[in-house]
Amino acid sequence: MTIALGRVTKEENDLFDIMDDWLRRDRFVFVGWSGLLLFPCAYFALGGWFTGTTFVTSWYTHGLASSYLEGCNFLTAAVSTPANSLAHSLLLLWGPEAQGDFTRWCQLGGLWTFVALHGAFALIGFMLRQFELARSVQLRPYNAISFSGPIAVFVSVFLIYPLGQSGWFFAPSFGVAAIFRFILFFQGFHNWTLNPFHMMGVAGVLGAALLCAIHGATVENTLFEDGDGANTFRAFNPTQAEETYSMVTANRFWSQIFGVAFSNKRWLHFFMLFVPVTGLWMSAIGVVGLALNLRAYDFVSQEIRAAEDPEFETFYTKNILLNEGIRAWMAAQDQPHENLIFPEEVLPRGNAL
């Protein structure tokens, strides 16, 4: 009995191979398979944002001016969220709300859902791009894994939080001042600064900035003198065969400063990766909790004592009162459709608070 072994011949012009060859070709700007998701979504997200901030009003959704055309500047322009009455509608241009009318679609806040969803997929495409390139040049995928932190924050804040609330209306609008207002909203309605997940997020981001500054300064301080160049950047010569800086010297320096120091480059750099990414993920988890209206720390005993004793006050009780002021002022402004009416004595008085 004879068994013939051989390869199955593929067509020379196989469509997949042609596309793979073109997409992954070495060019100035790598495209790749991930680019099929990244580039269109990033183009539409940025294009929608520039269009909205330039031309589109928020009068119909928030009663606000939000475009350059209406007199806003870069800090005050925004692509605003849809009205609360539209709940979690995807607001498709051809959907029942806009019915194919582009002007009506913009007035209803359709650009916000357009930018948010395309932006989320663009970020995912960018992470896939890092996976794809890492595989192509045989690198570990830690860059892509690290980028999951910003993606988690974006998705939790712009998508999951409003999904847990009554509609997209309660998500942040895409603008600088709009984001600031959302932060104030988070503080007033969720006491966000006292949330342990926010604390871990702040520790991660600021700790990463500190680590980055210390690491950069230490490397600069311990660069080898490898030539007669006039400046520090001589040491960045890519043809240099040996390592650029002295880990031993850096370890000795920080051992004397703190009593402890990293003695292993891999552990040092993993720690620099771990701190900010963990901080971002903790913040994202905290925002998911807020979507479900989970509360931050409540020191009820201090609130009760402050209510009983006018002379007893802590920074916590002062902040609780400030949060009440934010809620009283913001709720009526942001949700006029609720017809919220607060007695005059509980409302802040002008700029005096």
Curated annotation (Swiss-Prot):
One of its GO terms (cellular component) is plastid. Its main location: plastid. The modification Phosphothreonine is found at residue 2. The keyword Iron applies. InterPro entries: D1/D2, Photo_II_D1/D2_sf, Photo_RC_L/M, Photo_RC_L/M_CS, PSII_PsbD/D2. The chain crosses the membrane at residues 41-61, 125-141, 153-166, 208-228, 279-295. A plastoquinone binds at residues 215, 262. It comes from the Eukaryota. It catalyses: 2 a plastoquinone + 4 hnu + 2 H2O = 2 a plastoquinol + O2. One of its GO terms (molecular function) is iron ion binding. It is found in: Plastid, Chloroplast thylakoid membrane. PANTHER family: PHOTOSYSTEM II D2 PROTEIN (PTHR33149:SF12), PHOTOSYSTEM II PROTEIN D1 (PTHR33149). Belongs to the reaction center PufL/M/PsbA/D family. 2 of the reaction center chlorophylls (ChlD1 and ChlD2) are entirely coordinated by water. PSII is composed of 1 copy each of membrane proteins PsbA, PsbB, PsbC, PsbD, PsbE, PsbF, PsbH, PsbI, PsbJ, PsbK, PsbL, PsbM, PsbT, PsbX, PsbY, PsbZ, Psb30/Ycf12, at least 3 peripheral proteins of the oxygen-evolving complex and a large number of cofactors. It forms dimeric complexes. This is Photosystem II D2 protein. The lineage of its organism: Eukaryota, Viridiplantae, Streptophyta, Embryophyta, Tracheophyta. The gene is psbD.
